[in-house]
Amino acid sequence: MRFWVPLVGMTLSTFVFNTSEFMPIGLLTDIAADFNMTESAAGMLISVYAWAVMILSLPLMLCVTKVPPKRLLLGVIVLFSICQLLSAASVNFWMLMAARIGVAAAHAVFWSIITPLAVRVAPSSKASLALSMVGMGTSVAMIFGLPCGRMLGLAIG
């Protein structure tokens, strides 16, 4: 039963990471208006994020192979949080882009370790449950995270 708390934490983490990934999609028009640019130019924020995750995954994982998984997960969450705060405080598009690349780096490592970590904390008889819970965080982010993120973004500005 001890595995439930970390597993729920990992599920919530997948929700937060994916909501963060999807949120700019719902706010693209507002981002473009805030930085006085076209929506297609602001859309590079989403494309560069996706490319950064793809390109950084393998090199970053090669750099952190010796870091214990729990410490690595906590470090990734700290990096993610700091870069999200920098995103919120961005005064221009390029600062926002740099912060989002930092989030993408955290995202790349997060998705490389979260599923094996979920299976590791659960008893072997509950491995499929652990994987489905982590996957549920993604589904809930798509269904509720994106619209809630849009509402939050519009409310805060």
Where are these regions (language model features)?
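Paired small-residue
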Residues: 83, 94-102
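Helix-loop-helix hairpin linking two adjacent transmembrane segments in secondary transporters
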Residues: 95, 133-157
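Conserved MFS/SLC helix-loop-helix module at the cytosolic interface between two early adjacent transmembrane helices
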Residues: 55-91
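Cytoplasmic helix-loop-helix junction between adjacent transmembrane helices
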Residues: 99-137
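Helix-breaking motifs and short loop linkers at transmembrane-helix boundaries and internal kinks
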Residues: 36, 68, 89-95, 106
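Extracytoplasmic
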Residues: 6-39
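Residue-level signature of mid-helix packing/kink "hotspots" within the transmembrane helices
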Residues: 22, 50-58, 142-143
